[in-house]
Design a protein with these regions (language model features):
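Juxtadomain coupling helices with adjacent low-complexity linkers
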Residues: 202, 220-254
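Short, basic/aromatic recognition patches
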Residues: 90-98, 162-204, 242, 246-250
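N-terminal helix-turn-helix
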Residues: 2-84, 88, 245, 249-252
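Short, structured helix-loop boundary elements
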Residues: 13-16, 71, 84, 88, ...
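Amphipathic alpha-helical effector-binding/dimerization core
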Residues: 72-165
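Sensor-regulatory modules in signal-transduction proteins
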Residues: 211-214
Length: 254
């Protein structure tokens, strides 16, 4: 009886692991078909179908005409994290203030397993309407916020990031060389801010600064995005520097 229970426990853990692998693949590639998931994870279609059907039935995936997508159920978890993290209300207020002042798109981003995730965003009067939200991930090396975060890492940590994630090109302007990335991050450290010149989306520019907590640990990046002719060459740097000082002071006082 003992050995049977242990075997079942191991099988159950393996099943949970597979379910999360499927969820992560759908999240990163949605919408996806059953065949795409089966081929990507090297599992039979019948097995994948059972997993997908179960995840749909419990509300964590949605099945639409164009394929499977993650559901908004995950936003409830994100909201719980927001409530738990004391610095988030101050951060959200600062994002809103910056959007009003700059009249551009303002975003607060953070690093999640080597990818950039968008926590808060606010669109100013002239700002671009942005699709990225808490379900969207970007490579750190292709964004201003990501490079701002990377600039605070050691060389060994940056090399480990590249080993795990690579330096894939998102556009023809994306950095794809480790040497070039190191040079870029040195400039970010020297000037205190990072830029994105059409490295994620053609025609889009951005500038961002890293944000640290009371222990001087970087918790994310505050950035402004817009058309390359308005943002991307250091515009709004002073505005962001002032916002950084105020936000980090508020976080330290919590």
């Amino acid at each position: 009886m003992y050995f049977r229970t242990m075997a079942n426990s191991a099988d159950t853990l393996k099943s949970v692991e597979r379910a999360f692998r499927i969820l992560e693949f759908v999240r990163d590639n949605e919408p996806v078909s059953l065949t795409q998931v089966s081929e990507a994870l090297d599992m039979s279609k019948s097995t994948i179908h059972r997993y997908l059907s179960t995840l749909v039935s419990v509300g964590y995936l949605g099945q639409e005409v164009d394929g499977y997508r993650v559901s908004f159920e995950f936003l409830s978890y994100a909201n719980r994290i927001h409530l738990r993290e004391p610095s988030y209300p101050a951060t959200k207020r600062k994002v809103r203030e910056l959007a009003e002042t700059s009249e551009e798109l303002v975003q607060f981003t953070t690093d999640e397993k080597g990818r950039l995730v968008y926590l808060f965003k606010e669109t100013g009067r002239n700002g671009l309407v942005s699709r990225p939200d808490a379900r969207t991930f970007r490579p750190l090396h292709s964004t201003a916020g990501g490079k701002a975060i990377l600039s605070t890492w050691s060389d060994a940590e940056i090399e480990a990031y590249v080993d795990r994630n690579g330096l894939d090109a998102v556009t023809e302007h994306t950095i794809t060389s480790l040497d070039v990335l190191f040079e870029e991050l040195e400039r970010v450290r020297e000037h205190g801010y990072a830029t994105n010149k059409e490295e994620t989306v053609e025609g889009l520019g951005a500038v961002a600064v890293p944000i640290a907590d009371q222990d001087n640990e970087v918790v994310g990046a505050l950035g402004i995005s817009g058309p390359i002719n308005r943002v991307g060459n250091g515009e709004y740097v002073e505005l962001l520097r002032d916002a950084k000082k105020e936000l980090e002071l508020n976080i330290r006082l919590l």
